[in-house]
Amino acid sequence: MKTYPIIDWHCDVLMKLHQNPDYSFYDNENLDVNVLKLRKGGVKVQACAIFIDPDAYIDNKYDVALGQIDAFKNNVLKQEGIVHIKHFAEIENLKDDEIGVFLTLEGLDCVGSDITKVKQFIDEGVLSIGMTWNDANLACDGIGETRGAGLTTFGFDVVKLANDRDVFIDVSHISLNGFEDVLDTAKHVIASHSNVQKLASHRRNLNDGQIQRMKDKGALVHFVYCDAFVNDQHRVEPTTIQMLVDHIEHLHHAGLASQLGLGSDFDGISSKIMNLEDASQSQNLLHEISVRLGSAFAEDIAFGNFMRYVNRHF
């Protein structure tokens, strides 16, 4: 079976490493993402999200975020062959035996309304900002907030900063109105871990109008491996890789073939797809994509599409 190098745009391993400081990123079996599993699965570049448990006390969230950055520096980056990607163009400089890792920020709860803290995270290497998780914060409402408001003044300030620093804005958890505000104002937009609402009705998936807006903007859509976002109401058991490929094929046929990628959400999901249960099994998905949509497209969705975006825009 051919091995395709993969850029995985979302995982929550930093949360686990911060909560369990005795875990080694090299080989701890409790992690979906570790060095051994990344190598076995052919993952060449892994995004590591800073994500704070929504139940954490609000005054502690900033410190928790800093603690996750410490876990990134003192555990992830200490492993042999792991390289910190601070600018996307550096991906092309990775050696054959190296794996690149980069930071993203999932939700702005940890900064309150302090733009200086956002700048600090970008200075630490954050290359993408998700304005919200599912809840509301001082930048925007998340998709789980019934009010459904869009960006606040602070939220627009964050987008402006991201534009100035060539940082992505991630729309995977944002409210519908927030999505529209981001698409109207952000320079680089990604849905780092979302699927197709028409095929699985979860509120976090993209609806037809959002898909069209992403297409028109040339924004990136990366698919998530959580079975609840793949298998609507668990209509069939078990959830299979072929069902996830249905979502990919849907957007391929909708004209977004050159904008698609992968964002597993490993270490952030407990409900898995059969034979796609950790990073070591990543090539199983690429094999099914190649069977259905061809080897060239499998290469594109795994790595090529994103690198072409980087070469055009960075």
Language-model region placement:
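Short catalytic helix/loop segments, enriched in acidic residues and glycine
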Residues: 22-40, 282, 286
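Hydrophobic faces of well-ordered beta-strands that scaffold small-molecule active sites
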Residues: 6-9, 46-48, 101-105, 129-131, ...
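Histidine/acidic residue-rich metal-binding segments in metalloenzymes
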Residues: 113-123, 127, 145-190, 203-218, ...
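Conserved, mostly hydrophobic/aromatic
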Residues: 10, 38, 87, 125, ...
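Active-site beta-loop-alpha junctions enriched in small/polar residues
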Residues: 10-14, 51-53, 104-108, 134-136, ...
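A metal-dependent hydrolase metal-coordination microenvironment
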Residues: 32, 37-115, 140-164, 177-180
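Short acidic/histidine-rich active-site segments
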Residues: 255-277
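Mid-to-C-terminal alpha-helical segments outside catalytic/metal-binding sites
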Residues: 277-314
